[in-house]
């Protein structure tokens, strides 16, 4: 079940409040205006957008809004309910045969679980089922990585463009040393671009990338539990034994101890 992840906007609002309070407590409300500079903001955001446009093809950039939306949604998968589902399927398969699960499998809404069960019902062996399902997981992980990479690179570019703006401001300041009226505005550009770049990186792009990565790990975890459940049903494992296995396996700490299959660039697979 998908629900609104309120912690994402709460984090943004909380970070903004902390910055604003820090500024006001040091210089008052009137001093807050000193931290607003359109030129500095334009240098950072404009340069950041240019760098991102150069780095990614249009097809990846078009997906960015939908990927960003995932940071505001949390998927609530109840592992206990999932275990109960597999226990029920296993019990039914042992009593009436694996083929009797066909109707139940086709009614399942989760496409990953549905596909795995249909493979088992169609008579595919354990090794093939595991290979197909692991390939599905790897493909999903790669899609998520590509979507997340836009925000990861933006988090890298933002501080760099902040530094570029700082250099621009310093050059302008040194060029106008004879004009005292220009020292303040140019110094503001030099310092505020660094501030804006750091804020965009550490309060927007990097946290979003981190949240997207955590969501990917959670989804992989759920799918790994599904794979083990499907294999258990396919092999005719005793429902109680399958339940005991999945209860242990469904602990994230235990799952992280399992050897992971790592796919290299050449296509070979080895355990890490």
Curated annotation (Swiss-Prot):
Coiled-coil segments on the chain, per record: none
PROSITE patterns: MOTA
Lineage: superkingdom: Bacteria
Cytoplasmic face residues: 209-272
GO biological process: bacterial-type flagellum-dependent swarming motility; chemotaxis
Keyword annotations from UniProtKB, A to Z: Cell membrane, Membrane, Transmembrane, Transmembrane helix, Transport
Membrane topology classification: Multi-pass membrane protein
Transmembrane segment boundaries: 9-29, 38-58, 154-174, 188-208
Entry-linked Pfam families: MotA_ExbB
Cell compartments where the protein resides: Cell membrane
InterPro entries for the chain: Flag_MotA_CS, MotA-like, MotA_ExbB_proton_chnl
One cellular component (GO) term of this entry: plasma membrane
Function comment: May be involved in some transport function.
Sequence similarity: Belongs to the MotA family.
Protein name (database record): Uncharacterized protein YtxD
Gene: ytxD
